[in-house]
Amino acid sequence: SPIHMSKLNNLVQKATNTSADEEEASAKYSGLTGTPEMKKWYADEGEDVYIISDSLRLHGKRFKNSGSDYALVCHGYTSKAKHMAGFVKKFYDRGFNVLAVDARAHGDSEGAKIGMGWPERRDIAGWIKLILSWDPDARIILHGVSMGAATVLMASGETLPENVKAVIADCGYTSEWDEFIWEAETLHIPWFPVLNAASALSKLRDGYD
């Protein structure tokens, strides 16, 4: 309905609008990692929260704000939630409650295998469920960078509650295969037959390429 679309547009604009003043103040947020002050704020203000997904104990940081707008923030490959302090603070300053999560096998989350977003998509459903346990009326934006972007995009292909209103995917990739080819070429190493062997092993061991 027009009213529903208006509310959705307002939520997305709240998350993504950049005014001239904000562009001038971009150094305040210092990219995704944040300034030293933001890192301290992240450590001091965040509340540790946990879920169980695929028998793994996963860790996140919750930043409470007023209202029912939530941002679920996902980091990239080999990173961790605290490295997203700049994004977390920016969402928080715009009035969002924020949940920044450590992906499986990253940060303080359990796990030994990194799935580049495919198994991690299931974890997003668990985090959404946790948010809804706090606030059944939550309006949720999923935000991810790199592997986090791939994670939230793949999660968006699942059946999610209507509380999820938008997805912000920053520098995701078309496929793991293309990403690893690019990495190999960047390092000037042959991707064949290494990727083919790794793909076969992944399918045999974990059930997916």
What are these regions (language model features)?
Residues 1-52:
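An N-terminal hydrophobic leader/cap segment in hydrolases
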Residues 53-63:
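A short loop-to-beta-strand scaffold at the N-terminal edge of the catalytic core in hydrolase folds
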Residues 68-76:
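Short beta-strand element of the alpha/beta-hydrolase
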Residues 88-110:
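Conserved alpha/beta-hydrolase
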Residues 106-135, 139:
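Catalytic nucleophile-loop/oxyanion-hole region of alpha/beta-hydrolase
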Residues 142-144, 170:
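Short beta-strand immediately N-terminal to the catalytic nucleophile in serine-hydrolase-like folds
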Residues 144-148, 152:
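Gly/Ala-rich beta-loop-alpha elbow adjacent to hydrolase catalytic centers
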Residues 154-209:
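Hydrolase active-site cap/lid region
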